[in-house]
Amino acid sequence: MPSASLLVSTKRLNASKFQKFVSSLNKSTIAGFASVPLRAPPSVAFTRKKVGYSKRYVSSTNGFSATRSTVIQLLNNISTKREVEQYLKYFTSVSQQQFAVIKVGGAIISDNLHELASCLAFLYHVGLYPIVLHGTGPQVNGRLEAQGIEPDYIDGIRITDEHTMAVVRKCFLEQNLKLVTALEQLGVRARPITSGVFTADYLDKDKYKLVGNIKSVTKEPIEASIKAGALPILTSLAETASGQMLNVNADVAAGELARVFEPLKIVYLNEKGGIINGSTGEKISMINLDEEYDDLMKQSWVKYGTKLKIREIKELLDYLPRSSSVAIINVQDLQKELFTDSGAGTMIRRGYKLVKRSSIGEFPSADALRKALQRDAGISSGKESVASYLRYLENSDFVSYADEPLEAVAIVKKDTNVPTLDKFVCSDAAWLNNVTDNVFNVLRRDFPALQWVVSENDANIAWHFDKSQGSYLKGGKVLFWYGIDDINTISELVENFVKSCDTASTLNSSASSGVFANKKSARSYSTRSTPRPEGVNTNPGRVALIGARGYTGKNLVSLINGHPYLEVAHVSSRELKGQKLQDYTKSEIIYESLQIQDIRKLEEQNAVDFWVMALPNKVCEPFVETIQSVHGKSKIIDLSADHRFVSESDWAYGLPELNDRAKIANAAKIANPGCYATGSQLTISPLTKYINGLPTVFGVSGYSGAGTKPSPKNDPKFLNNNLIPYALSDHIHEREISARIGHNVAFMPHVGQWFQGISLTVSIPIKKGSLSIDEIRKLYRNFYEDEKLVHVIDDIPLVKDIEGTHGVVIGGFKLNDAEDRVVVCATIDNLLKGAATQCLQNINLAMGYGEYAGIPENKIIGV
C-alpha cells in the first residue's frame, strides 16, 4: 500500500483535541453565556452578573459549583467545536423569547419532574429562556376514572363538560405549581402563567362542550416574565372574550405560541421520547411531511392524540419557514436536541420528496441541473465546465438522487467495481435542514458499498468521517468508503486514489475533487463594468416590502417616498400590523402581515412590480418559491445573504459599480450585497491584479448594523467609550468579499459607539516595487472616474462625514517603505449605500429607470 496517512474515523474528540476544545470553550463560550464568570479562587463572591436585560443574582456559596456543574453538563452534551459554534451562532442571535417553545406532556411532570426541572435549570443557567407550556392529560384521566367517569374523546379532542372542566382546571393549577416549585428549589426564577395568554372561541360547543379554538395570543405576560429574568411556565387554558374558561389541547396551544414567536426550536416532551410506530414498536426518528403525511395518517395505529398531534404539527409547519422543524423527545434528550446536530427522538419537518433519476432528461430542466451543479467547487472555480460535465453524464452509467428544488444533488457513477459518489452538491439550506442525511440514507439503502473524495479542509469533514467506514489522506484530499471488508479491494481503491492525486499534482491542480467542497468562485473586478443602461421607463412601479420594520426598510421607504416613479403598494410586518407606515406621504399605507397565500394572490393579480425581501437570513425562501410558482412578471430583490453565493444566472449580484449593469438590469432576481462587503470590495478591487498575499480588512460599524433586536452590540450604554470585536474569522462577509474579488481576505468586524456608518482600514500586500504611491492614487481615480457614488480623496475619510450620505469615500492611501503593502481607508453608510441606496440602484436598473433616480443629489459626496 502506498505510504500516506491512513485515518481511523472516530466520533469523539481525542485527548489533545479535547484539551484544545475545552480551552476554546473557556475563552469564547463560557464567557458569553455562563450565568457567572469562572474565577479563582472559588471563595470570590459573584454578584449582579447581567444576563440580557434581566438581572440574575448568584450567591457566593453556590455560584462557582453551579457554574462548574453547568459547564460540565454542557460539555457532556456538546462534543464538537462545530456544535459550540452552533450554540453561539443561533442561540445568541435572537431575542430571548425566540429561543424555544417547549411543550411538556403531563406524564413528564408526574414521572420525570426532577429531570425536567434540572434540564430547564441548565438552560436558565446558560442564559436561555424557553417558553414552557405543559399539559395535564394523565392527571385529568386519573382523577376522572377515580370518580367512575370514563374520559370521552372525539378525533383526539377531550369532550369537556362543566364537571370535566373543573377537574381540568384543578389539575392544571396543581401541575403548574409543582413544576414552578421544583424549578425554584434549583435556584431558577420561574413565573406561573395559568391564564391570560390565549383568547379563544368555542371549537364546537354542541360537539366538544367547553373546548376552545385559539384566536389570538397575548405576548405581554410571557415577554414580561422573560424580561424580569424568570422562565414563563404556561398552561393551555384559554378564555373567551367574556371570560369563560375553555380547555385547549396543549399541543395545539404550543403550536399557536410557535406561530407567534417563531422560535429557533419547537420541542414536544413526552414520556415515550418520540412517536412510536404502532406496527413495529420502534421509535420513528424522522417524518418528512411532504412525502409521508398522507400515508402516515392512513395507518391504523395513528389515532386519537397521535393523529391530532401530527395534524397540528403539519398545520404549524405549513406556515413557518421550510427550515423549521418540531422535535418530539423525552426529557433526558432535551439538551442533546438543543445543542447537537444529531438531535434525538422524532423530528418532524416538511422536507422534500427525494427523486431518483438515471438520465439528464429526467430532471425538471437542463437549466435546473446546471444551476445546481454551479455549487460544485470544480465547476464554480472554472476548472470544469457544466457543459462538459453534462456531456460526460450523457454517456455514463449513473444514478442521481435529489430533493425537489435540487438543493441537494448526489450523482453516483456505477462504472467502477465500487460505485463512486462523483458529485454531491448541497446548498447551505440543505446542510442546515439535514437534507444531506436524507440523501445519504438513500445512498446507503441502494449502494451496499460506496467511495468518495473530500478536501481535508471541507467545513463538513466530521460529517464525512461519521458516514464512512474507513478513510485515507493524501495531498490534502481524503478518500472515504463504506461497505468494503476485503483488504485487497481497499488496497486497489487507495492505489487508484493516490495515482489520481499524483496526476493532479503534476497538472498543478490544488483543488479537491469537488465532492462536498466549499470553495469560492474566482472572479476579478480588475476591468470596469459595462456601460450604464439609459433610463427610459417613466411608468409607475409598485413595490412590496416584506419584513420592513428594521432600519433598512425605513430608509428604503424614505427613498421611495422621494422617487419620481416608485410607490409603496404593500408593506408587511407581523409586529406592526394595522399601524400606519410612517414618513410615507404619497398615500396612506397600513402595515399588513402577508402570508404565503396573500403573496400568491398578489402575484397572480399582477399587483406588485418589485418584491423587496427585507428578512433575516434563511427566512425568505418560501416567499420566493411562492412568487416564482405563479410565473408572473414581477422581480425580486433579497437583502439577506441567502442568494449572494448562488449562480448569477439565477440571482444577479447587485453591486453596479463592479458588476455588469446590463446583467442586473435584465435579472428577475437580485441579491443585494452586504454593507461591509460592498465597502471592502470597492476598496480592494482596483488593486486586484496586484494582490500578492492575504488582504486584511479591519472594519468598525455603527451599532445600527447590529439590527433592532436588543443585544450588547446595539446597546448605546454598553457601547459608551467601548469597542466590541465579534466574528473575527469566517464571518459571512469574509466569504462574500473573497468570493467576489477572487482572492481570500481576512475580515475583522467591530461595533463602535456611533449609530450608523462604517470605517474600513484595508491592508493589501502587493508585489514589491510594482506600484508607487502616485500610481496607486491615479489607479483609484481612473477606476472610479465615472462612478457617481464612489468618491476618491487623498485624505483619510471620516465616518462623521459619510453618515446619512449615499456613497463610498475611499482615501488615506499609504505605501509602506518596503513598497510591498498598500493601506487604503474607506467609509460607507451601512444603512444607505450599504443597504437601502444600493437596493434602490438595483431596482432602478431592473425597472429601466435612471440608476440614481430617487437618490438625493445633496446627499452624495463629491457631487
Swiss-Prot record:
* Main location group: mitochondrion
Pfam families, alphabetized? AA_kinase, NAT, Semialdhyde_dh, Semialdhyde_dhC_1
User: What residues bear Phosphoserine in this entry?
Assistant: S359
**Modes of activity regulation:** The kinase activity is inhibited by arginine.
The similarity annotation says: In the N-terminal section; belongs to the acetylglutamate kinase family.
Q: What is this protein called?
A: Protein ARG5,6, mitochondrial
Q: Which GO terms describe its cellular component?
A: mitochondrial matrix; mitochondrion
Q: Which InterPro entries match?
A: AceGlu_kinase-like_sf, AcgluKinase_fam, AGPR_AS, AGPR_type-1, Asp/Glu/Uridylate_kinase, NAD(P)-bd_dom_sf, NAGK-fArgBP, NAGK/NAGSA
Which terms are listed as keywords in the entry?
Amino-acid biosynthesis, Arginine biosynthesis, ATP-binding, Kinase, Mitochondrion, Multifunctional enzyme, NADP, Nucleotide-binding, Oxidoreductase, Phosphoprotein, Transferase, Transit peptide
**Catalytic activity reported:** N-acetyl-L-glutamate 5-semialdehyde + phosphate + NADP(+) = N-acetyl-L-glutamyl 5-phosphate + NADPH + H(+); N-acetyl-L-glutamate + ATP = N-acetyl-L-glutamyl 5-phosphate + ADP
- Post-translational changes noted in the entry: The protein precursor is cleaved into the two biologically active enzymes, the kinase and the reductase.
The cross-references to CDD domains, in alphabetical order and at most eight, read:
AAK_NAGK-fArgBP (cd04252), AGPR_C_ARG5_6_like (cd23936), AGPR_N_ARG5_6_like (cd24149), DUF619-NAGK-FABP (cd04263)
Cite the SUPFAM superfamilies for this sequence. Answer: Carbamate kinase-like (SSF53633), Glyceraldehyde-3-phosphate dehydrogenase-like, C-terminal domain (SSF55347), NAD(P)-binding Rossmann-fold domains (SSF51735)
EC number(s) on record?
A: 1.2.1.38, 2.7.2.8
State the pathway, as annotated in the record: Amino-acid biosynthesis; L-arginine biosynthesis; N(2)-acetyl-L-ornithine from L-glutamate: step 2/4; Amino-acid biosynthesis; L-arginine biosynthesis; N(2)-acetyl-L-ornithine from L-glutamate: step 3/4
**Residue ranges constituting the N-acetyltransferase domain according to the UniProt record:** 353-505
Report the SS bond pairs: none
Active-site residues, record numbering mapped to chain: C675
Q: Which Gene3D superfamilies match?
A: 3.40.630.30, Acetylglutamate kinase-like, Dihydrodipicolinate Reductase, domain 2, NAD(P)-binding Rossmann-like Domain
Instruction: Write down the PANTHER family for this protein, in alphabetical order.
Output: N-ACETYLGLUTAMATE SYNTHASE (PTHR23342), N-ACETYLGLUTAMATE SYNTHASE, MITOCHONDRIAL (PTHR23342:SF0)
Comment field (misc): Present with 1180 molecules/cell in log phase SD medium.
SMART domains in the cross-refs: Semialdhyde_dh (SM00859)
The record's subcellular locations are: Mitochondrion
Any Gene Ontology biological process = regulation of DNA-templated transcription
